[in-house]
From Swiss-Prot:
InterPro entries registered for this protein in UniProt: AcOrn/SuccOrn_fam, Aminotrans_3, Aminotrans_3_PPA_site, Class-III_PLP-dep_AT, Orn_aminotrans, Ornith_aminotrans_bact, PyrdxlP-dep_Trfase, PyrdxlP-dep_Trfase_major
GO molecular function: identical protein binding; ornithine aminotransferase activity; pyridoxal phosphate binding
PROSITE patterns: AA_TRANSFER_CLASS_3 (PS00600)
Protein name as catalogued: Ornithine aminotransferase 1
Domain of life where this protein originates: Bacteria
Keywords for this protein: Amino-acid biosynthesis, Aminotransferase, Cytoplasm, Proline biosynthesis, Pyridoxal phosphate, Transferase
N6-(pyridoxal phosphate)lysine PTM sites in chain numbering: 252
Compartments, record wording: Cytoplasm
Any one of the GO BP annotations: L-proline biosynthetic process
Gene (name only): rocD1
Pathway the protein takes part in: Amino-acid biosynthesis; L-proline biosynthesis; L-glutamate 5-semialdehyde from L-ornithine: step 1/1
Native source organism of the sequence: Staphylococcus saprophyticus subsp. saprophyticus (strain ATCC 15305 / DSM 20229 / NCIMB 8711 / NCTC 7292 / S-41)
Length: 394
């Protein structure tokens, strides 16, 4: 009889190469494997479970809604959609929202919206509309999102991709000034790059991008799919620079770890370019998704998880920056979104931490990304600090 790993690998596609660790249960900031070993989860499904694993309030919302109605086509109204729309729009200070399912769908929607806005509002010819993205970004792996990537290894073999995409170094406003022109319809960026290595831009960079967009009448798209909803100690990472984008992209923890839901938020002057037939989603905004998402947003507020991320994130960052290790190049982060950059490959050290009960994952080969659920408590944070210190100082 095949074991769990062989059984899974026999039928799985080969686009993932997971660690041989199979999880069977999760509660709060902790998970348990099939042998009942416990770990503090510092991956959080890449910020999907900001509210913690299996939060009872979110589960209750899912259970109750699933007994009423789960699916209503957007050809009709439902009793939940308007309530959810109002909640998320007020949170993001935007007038309109377009619900989708996954993060990459939100990015694809934003690309379409930006191009349509450029054609309708700026009168840019469809053949010459340009978008500027940042080097080191990650916006998804569907064709439109992939076209924004600056990493050739992600794109190789999948062409032809979207054209007229240009790249600037993240944090280099002078490069942006050279690239932007009257054919530019949008600049898209992550306020803090996640997959790229927990990269924090220089002070005022985001504000300068906003000013540049204003000068050229260009849309600023903030991809907060991973860093939004409290992860960095602010509800939105853009708040660190007191800057408003034209379009917010949200996903991941918007569904509380239970249901895929994403959102594209903008004011009416931008959103109105999408008219009936120009875009849609079979499952986007369904009653079950809305019920789950409303509960997920309530948990963020009622349990003060944004403040918890700020407070415990400061504690975590301070202690990690005090580790004395020749391996460490830099420890950087905001809130509970921290990167430990090493001068060697990070995978072995991640595996050592996992063996000691802290679940983590490397990115870009040499960076350990630490991003626990925002429900984590002080004792759990201190245990994370102890394990990381023990592994890296050794």
């Amino acid at each position: 009889m095949l074991d769990l790993y062989e059984h899974t690998d026999k039928y799985s596609s080969k686009n993932y190469s997971p660690l041989k660790l199979a999880l069977a249960k999760g509660r709060g900031a902790k998970v348990w494997d099939i042998e009942d070993n416990c770990y503090i989860d510092c991956i959080s499904g890449f910020s999907v479970v900001n509210q913690g694993h299996c939060h009872p309030k979110i589960i209750k919302a899912l259970q109750e809604q699933s007994q009423r109605i789960t699916m209503v086509s957007r050809a009709l109204y439902s009793d939940n959609l308007g309530k959810w729309e109002e909640k998320i729009c007020k949170l993001a200070n935007k007038e309109n929202v377009l619900p989708m399912n996954t993060g990459t769908e939100a990015v694809e929607t934003a690309i379409k919206m930006a191009r349509k806005w450029g054609a309708d509002i700026k009168n840019i010819d469809e053949s010459s509309s340009e978008i500027i993205a940042m080097n080191g970004n990650f916006h998804g792996r569907t064709l439109g999102s992939l076209s924004l990537s600056s990493q050739d290894s992600y794109k190789k073999g999948f062409g032809p991709l979207l054209n007229n995409i240009h790249y600037a170094d993240f944090g280099d406003i002078e490069q942006l000034k050279k690239l932007i022109n009257n054919q530019t319809t949008a600049i898209i960026l992550e306020p803090i790059q996640g997959e790229g290595g927990v990269n924090i831009p220089p002070t005022h960079f985001i504000q300068e991008v906003r000013q540049l967009c204003n000068e050229y009448n260009v849309l600023l798209i903030a991809d907060e799919i991973q860093v939004g909803l409290g992860r960095t100690g602010k509800m939105f990472a853009m708040e660190w620079e007191n800057t408003e984008p034209d379009i917010y992209l949200l996903g991941k923890s918007l569904g509380g770890g239970l249901y895929p839901i994403s959102a594209v938020l903008a004011n009416q002057d931008v959103m109105s370019v999408l008219t009936p037939g120009t875009h849609g989603s079979t499952f986007g905004g369904n009653p079950l998704a809305c019920a789950v998402s409303m509960a997920a947003l309530d948990v963020l507020n009622e349990e003060h998880l944004v403040q918890n991320a700020l407070d415990l994130g400061d504690r975590l960052l301070k202690h990690l920056q005090q580790i004395e290790s020749e391996l460490i190049v830099e420890v950087r982060g905001r809130g509970l979104f921290i990167g430990i950059e090493l001068n060697v490959a990070a995978q072995d050290y991640c595996e050592q931490m996992i063996n000691k009960g802290v679940l983590c994952k490397e990115t870009q080969g040499n960076i350990i990304r630490i991003a626990p659920p925002l429900v984590i408590d002080k004792d759990e944070i201190d245990e994370v600090i102890r394990v990381i210190t023990e592994v890296l100082e050794k």
